[in-house]
A protein has these predicted regions:
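Pre-Walker A (Motif I) flank of P-loop NTPase domains
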Residues: 18-22
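ATP-dependent small-molecule kinase phosphotransfer cores
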Residues: 57-121
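Small-molecule kinase domains that catalyze NTP-dependent phosphoryl transfer to phosphate-bearing small molecules
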Residues: 76-82, 162-206
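NTP-dependent small-molecule kinase module
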Residues: 111-114, 183-232
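Conserved phosphate-donor/acceptor-positioning beta-strand/loop module used by diverse small-molecule
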Residues: 135-158, 163-171
């Protein structure tokens, strides 16, 4: 599949108010991706997650597998050790070639995300999108989480694994996401200050999460989210 882009120059405070973007960060097993898809149907706008990897591959000519290897995670155990020992500076990168390659892949994805925010209304799940679009005026950022027992139960059912294995997968995936965000955004992925608001998907359910986000979009951008129009 081919994707077309209008590569733009981005400056602080940009982002067309004729379209809007919702970014969703999520804990593994919280249902954040599913909430994004439900929201997409309700609002009539696309929801992007791993499609961004395909877009980045088409745009750059780099094999999609390269982007899959760094999908919200860092390559190499030395990265984890470096993250634990060295304070993160927003513009600081180590000299290892593998890390620089990862940084290049991230920058390509970031350009795709910025271009989407400039050209269409959409939902972006993960990919550090809240940070990438932090200076855009047309963006709402949401963090979705759920209690561990709820995440374990959901992963057990979804992947047909034991509770022990589900727990391991949650810890591993969330650790990857934490390190990824800390590296590229220079902050704590779970810090609520990074987002417009946070939601406990287990407390109120996915449907009500969708409704709350729609209400926030309506208030923030003065948009009728109950009767959206094409291209809004």
């Amino acid at each position: 599949m081919q994707w077309l882009f209008f590569v733009s120059i981005f400056r602080k405070g940009e982002g067309s108010m004729e379209n809007y973007v919702i970014t969703i960060a999520r804990g593994f097993g919280s249902g954040g991706k599913e909430i994004g898809k439900m929201l997409s149907k309700e609002l009539g706008i696309p929801c992007y997650e791993n499609q961004i990897l395909e877009m980045a591959s088409d745009y750059s000519g780099i094999d999609k597998d390269e982007f899959m290897q760094v999908d919200e995670k860092l390559r190499g155990t030395y990265i984890s050790n470096w993250l634990e020992k060295v304070p993160i500076l927003k513009n600081a990168v180590p000299v290892e070639s593998e890390f620089v390659s990862d940084l290049h892949l991230f920058q390509i994805q970031a350009e795709i995300i910025r271009d989407l925010a400039m050209t269409q209304s959409c939902i972006i799940v993960g990919k550090c999108a809240d940070h990438v679009l932090r200076n855009f005026n047309n963006v709402i950022s949401v963090y979705i989480e759920a209690p561990r027992h709820a995440c374990v139960d959901r992963i057990c059912k979804r992947l047909n694994v034991t509770p022990k294995r589900a727990e391991e997968l949650i810890k591993k995936t969330d650790k990857y996401r934490y390190e990824y965000y800390k590296c590229y955004a220079g902050g704590d992925w779970r810090n609520p200050i990074n987002y417009d608001f946070t939601l406990n998907s287990d407390r109120i359910g996915w449907e009500h999460c969708v409704e709350l986000i729609k209400q926030y979009v309506s208030i923030r951008f003065n948009i009728d989210t109950e009767h959206p129009t094409d291209g809004e």
